[in-house]
């Protein structure tokens, strides 16, 4: 049996650093990375988003999941106030859409040449942004955002069935694997607390 690759995830500070760097680069990069994290998407899923998948009036996005052919309708995050502006999907998407040029393909995220952003291009731009933001190379891939989202949801008490739906897992078994990661985070936090106390 093949050994499973170690799951990598970003801390809250690392996610913030990546989003700040993405925002500094472009509205497209900020929107694509934020949506990837918020909805626990794979690179191919975010690159496959079309303008018709967005319902800005009702603040929703339809996501076609790659594995299991699931379709989920999810709310777009809207946060009032500057302290949460990096996570305000509605505001970030409006900014991006205002400057986006139409290519006729209908894809939401476009390359600098105006065609659909490919998975390879998205992975490359995420890696560049993550490395510039100080993220370790082994964490500098878009799938770490999906791992991070699952881990953060579970660590904050969201039940497994809700996490499964939010990130588009077909099987609850795919979601359960994140419990161990959350336990690992808790153990590390306990060690840090003990080090400060003793």
Regions found by a protein language model. Name each.
Residues 2, 12-43, 101-103:
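Basic, Lys/Arg- and aromatic-enriched nucleic-acid-binding interface segment
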Residues 53-56, 139, 158-179:
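Short, polar N-cap/turn motifs at the start of nucleic acid-interacting alpha helices
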Residues 1-9, 194-198:
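C-terminal secondary-structure termini that scaffold catalytic or DNA-interacting sites
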Residues 65-68, 167, 172-192:
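Catalytic-site neighborhood detector that most strongly recognizes the C-terminal catalytic loop/helix
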Residues 22-25, 124-165:
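Short, basic (Lys/Arg/His-rich) helix/loop patches that form interaction surfaces
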Residues 36-58:
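Short, charged phosphate-coordinating catalytic segments
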Residues 35-36, 152-153, 166, 178:
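Short alpha-helical segment immediately N-terminal to, or the first helix within
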Residues 21, 57-60, 66-112:
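Basic, alpha-helical nucleic-acid-contacting "clamp/cap" segments
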């Amino acid at each position: 049996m093949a050994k499973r690759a170690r799951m990598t995830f970003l801390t809250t500070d690392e996610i913030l650093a990546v989003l700040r760097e993405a925002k500094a680069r472009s509205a497209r990069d900020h929107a694509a990375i934020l949506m990837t994290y918020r909805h626990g998407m794979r690179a191919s899923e975010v690159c496959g988003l079309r303008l018709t998948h967005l319902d800005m009036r009702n603040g929703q996005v339809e996501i076609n999941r790659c594995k299991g052919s699931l379709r989920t309708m999810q709310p777009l995050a809207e946060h009032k106030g500057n302290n949460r502006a990096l996570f305000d999907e509605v505001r970030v998407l409006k900014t991006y859409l205002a400057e986006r040029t139409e290519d006729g393909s209908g894809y939401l995220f476009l390359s600098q040449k105006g065609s659909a952003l490919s998975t390879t291009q998205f992975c490359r731009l995420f890696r560049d942004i993550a490395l510039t933001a100080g993220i370790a190379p082994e964490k500098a891939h878009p799938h770490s955002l999906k791992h991070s989202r699952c881990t953060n949801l579970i660590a904050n008490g969201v039940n497994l069935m809700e996490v499964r739906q939010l990130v588009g897992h077909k099987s609850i078994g795919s979601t359960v694997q994140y419990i161990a990661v959350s336990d690992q985070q808790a153990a590390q936090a306990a060690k840090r607390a003990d080090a400060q106390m003793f």
